[in-house]
Amino acid sequence: EISLNGYGRFGLQYVEDRGVGLEDTIISSRLRINIVGTTETDQGVTFGAKLRMQWDDGDAFAGTAGNAAQFWTSYNGVTVSVGNVDTAFDSVALTYDSEMGYEASSFGDAQSSFFAYNSKYDASGALDNYNGIAVTYSISGVNLYLSYVDPDQTVDSSLVTEEFGIAADWSNDMISLAAAYTTDAGGIVDNDIAFVGAAYKFNDAGTVGLNWYDNGLSTAGDQVTLYGNYAFGATTVRAYVSDIDRAGADTAYGIGADYQFAEGVKVSGSVQSGFANETVADVGVRFDF
């Protein structure tokens, strides 16, 4: 069985003092298409593979070529993936819940380097031998994640740095908890990073959450992000503040809103200020298919 899914988005993006000779405000867009193939045995074991095609404004034509494939097998709550895998740190719940705007961005995200699913074709060839293994297990509201990434599997392991990650999350109708830990994140020696998050849904319309990050070797140090959202009918208002343990850094913050036109179609906007007091803003439309 073959299926297609993805999304398109387009709108205005503003970055204060983007660069010498560069416009601060541009039209920003993306088209993402996932090609997913699955089959199931008589015993109920599912085998699957995924390829992604993605174009962002500014990409060369090669940017729309398929990325590296991901393969998986799943049975009774256990999924084992190989290839271009979703890593534990990038997959755990809550870590991206402060994001806002049609581009889904936030200064409240982790400021560290770590491996994640590679969405695009790598024209440089740097990822030709990148490979990983990931295992997930789900039961009774608990999700467990384990991942391993070798950035170049053809080179002796003593000459490259491999990333190992573990994570878990749990949720009921009101409370969500999550945690993750990764060693040598992003293939950087001794770049050990961590995350702990909690969220409380105080009614059907509103949620508040608190995330803590140890950003490893990043100059950001420890980071705390407080965020919340509240829905008024078809409109959802979002806000966050984030602080890092770096001398002279400003407190980052953002406020945004979504309006749901229909299922899978929304207009979103945000205004955010970063750790260097830089201002970014966006407004645009996203539609899922």
Curated annotation (Swiss-Prot):
Coiled coil: none annotated. The keyword Transport applies. It is found in: Cell outer membrane. One of its GO terms (molecular function) is porin activity. GO terms for cellular component: cell outer membrane; pore complex. It comes from the Bacteria. The keyword Ion transport applies. One of its GO terms (biological process) is monoatomic ion transport. It is a multi-pass membrane protein. Keywords: Cell outer membrane, Ion transport, Membrane, Porin, Transmembrane, Transmembrane beta strand, Transport. Forms channels that allow the passive diffusion of small hydrophilic solutes up to an exclusion limit of about 0.6 kDa. Homotrimer. This is Porin. The gene is opmA.
